[in-house]
């Protein structure tokens, strides 16, 4: 059963739209696509266990690596948004996909809660004040089975 099949109405439709766009975006990165589906499933399970909003967890899991396919552009985009880059910009590209996506995705998916974008932002390096949703996505990214 896919993630969106576990929801109804507008939530189901939005998750289906996200998954379809993700499929196209990651057409050349199938392992990344399968990983994102796995993170969404794992985040949904963790959300159920820990009492976190299920929809937000599933949505954040799906989009958490949205910009990972843009490694060549991430430093430029990060600088454009004023994201601070510590150390070598080339080394930072592995970590910038979360913060950059958190700036851009609200325009594409305005229906999603700001908490979803914060979880996407924080899934690479965490934060001292992580919310339960942030932690669910952070852990799901590390433990998903794919």
Report the location of each language-model feature.
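Divalent metal-dependent catalytic cores for phosphoryl transfer on phosphate-bearing substrates
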Residues: 20-26, 35, 44-146
